[in-house]
Amino acid sequence: MPLLWLRGFLLASCWIIVRSSPTPGSEGHGSAPDCPSCALATLPKDGPNSQPEMVEAVKKHILNMLHLKKRPDVTQPVPKAALLNAIRKLHVGKVGENGYVEIEDDIGRRAEMNELMEQTSEIITFAESGTARKTLHFEISKEGSDLSVVERAEVWLFLKVPKANRTRTKVTIRLFQQQKHPQGSLDTGDEAEEMGLKGERSELLLSEKVVDARKSTWHIFPVSSSIQRLLDQGKSSLDVRIACEQCQESGASLVLLGKKKKKEVDGDGKKKDGSDGGLEEEKEQSHRPFLMLQARQSEDHPHRRRRRGLECDGKVNICCKKQFFVSFKDIGWNDWIIAPSGYHANYCEGECPSHIAGTSGSSLSFHSTVINHYRMRGHSPFANLKSCCVPTKLRPMSMLYYDDGQNIIKKDIQNMIVEECGCS
């Protein structure tokens, strides 16, 4: 039974390899049009007819992805002036200085944004009481300290207002960052001593907001620039003093917390009567202040750099991406394809030695690593399997073209252009 299961897994794995490498296309077409990278890699490159054969493979692939059996017959092309006017009105593209149409690459931008969002971490850090009165301490996790580009950072505070409050409708809340300096480098003065600030410290206004004091609710204070400075300095903690001079007059209170339990304080930092009841504290636990951080690693961060596929330069024989551009004007297709001017029909070629099979960054890396583990140890039936050089990253492409009825069509095609190659 285990052997039968193993054979089944092997067959499924081979099917995954075959199905993962091509660009998806319509059913009912041959494998070559569905996978230009695979088709181009198998064609001879040195023969006299190699270039025409490669171009024909690209043509079939484009028609397949547009769900066309043949190229549209454009017998009476639309006058260029009318075409350009329609494009401007429909906002599907723009006309360059050279008169050529350029497509607004919304799909490409969306793909880049999605990739960026996948690399962004969101961290919520709950506050602890600081070393002085009315201060909060936020300790960013190790996950956060490994990030270096702040997309967004906010401190969330809950303002509790008694139901009978009508004396003041607005209060001002200020957040000050507590900064520690080397001994003797700063004159803190009497005010710092009154605030309970020990040592050489200064304050920097982080955020200021006028809020409604007629209802209990959360208030958000942006602190992105401050968190960015902390990360740039290699620090991972933020100390904040909260100030609300009008809170006492209005009866409102900011919900802060102590070392072991949360407490309510008024504008002067004094504990309010009746706020230490166990039931009340349990009820208010959800109002604990917190810091919300969205950040990512920088482009040049050593841990962020994933292994990118090689570019074929004629000097390497291992798996790499071969650049191949087909101009629609050169192949006589610019009469029905309005934009872009050509297609980057990149493909993968090269050898896959055992030591690079299943490399990091490949969408097939986990599967490949498992197979390669058994293959290198001679375990049958994996011993005779060979790694393949396949696309590991593809990007979309937008096309603007005429159909047989002289209609202008804009189509966004996923997984159209090979960006990186790797060993399966």
UniProtKB/Swiss-Prot annotation:
Uterus, ovary and liver. This is Inhibin beta A chain. GO terms for biological process: activin receptor signaling pathway; androgen metabolic process; androst-4-ene-3,17-dione biosynthetic process; autophagy; cardiac fibroblast cell development; cellular response to angiotensin; cellular response to cholesterol; cellular response to follicle-stimulating hormone stimulus. The lineage of its organism: Eukaryota, Metazoa, Chordata, Craniata, Vertebrata. Residues 1-20 form the signal peptide. It comes from Mus musculus (Mouse). It comes from the Eukaryota. Gene3D superfamilies: 2.60.120.970, Cystine-knot cytokines. SUPFAM superfamilies: Cystine-knot cytokines. It is found in: Secreted. Disulfide bonds join C312-C320, C319-C389, C348-C421, C352-C423. Residues 264-275 have a biased composition (Basic and acidic residues). Glycans are attached at N165.
